């Protein structure tokens, strides 16, 4: 089952996506897409790893080369997040982003978290506009394939396709 969870900054999307994964009794995998650029990023990653360890997630670092991720046949994976992955694809040679369907075929459930950054109403030029268009294409393509699509607003999930996975 493929579930796409969208939301703005601090909307509760990540917490909601994690709660979906925690409902399953299957092995849990966290596909981490953040690239560590500095000490602040490293501290954030360490904090999140510690939080997930208590919840029995196995972390798979995949800021690039998502196509190389190998997961056991049964399990539930949480990919956090498509915004990072899209940026990595745009700004890194040989970037990832095209291979989410391959990852989905490896596990029983895949929950994807993505950013809702299209409501600002501002026009951007150059790289920012290119990034927003790329992320919109990724979100649209995955929403079309997904069994469930929801947007989290103020911590409340609103489903546009499917419903709460059991």
Regions found by a protein language model. Give the residues of each.
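Conserved P-loop
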Residues: 2-71
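Short secondary-structure boundary segments
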Residues: 8, 81, 114-116
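Hydrophobic beta-strand segments of well-ordered beta-sheets in folded domains
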Residues: 27-30, 77, 110, 115
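Residue-level signal for inorganic ion chemistry
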Residues: 17, 48, 78, 115, ...
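Portal/gating segments that form or line small-molecule/metal binding sites
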Residues: 46, 50-98, 109
């Amino acid at each position: 089952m493929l579930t796409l969870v969208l939301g703005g900054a601090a909307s509760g999307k990540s917490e909601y996506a994690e709660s979906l994964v925690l409902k399953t009794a299957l092995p849990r995998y966290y596909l981490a897409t953040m690239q560590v650029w500095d000490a602040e990023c490293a501290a954030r990653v360490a904090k999140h790893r510690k939080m997930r360890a208590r919840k029995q997630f196995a972390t798979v670092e995949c800021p690039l080369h998502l196509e190389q991720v190998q997961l056991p046949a049964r399990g539930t994976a949480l990919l956090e997040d498509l915004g990072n992955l899209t940026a990595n694809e745009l700004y890194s040679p040989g970037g990832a982003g095209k291979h989410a369907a391959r990852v989905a075929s490896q596990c029983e459930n895949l929950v994807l978290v993505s950013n809702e950054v299209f409501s600002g109403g501002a026009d951007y030029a150059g790289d920012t506009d290119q990034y927003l268009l790329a992320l919109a294409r990724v979100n649209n393509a995955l929403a079309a394939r997904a069994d469930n699509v929801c947007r989290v607003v103020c911590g409340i999930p609103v489903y546009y396709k499917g419903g709460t996975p059991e």
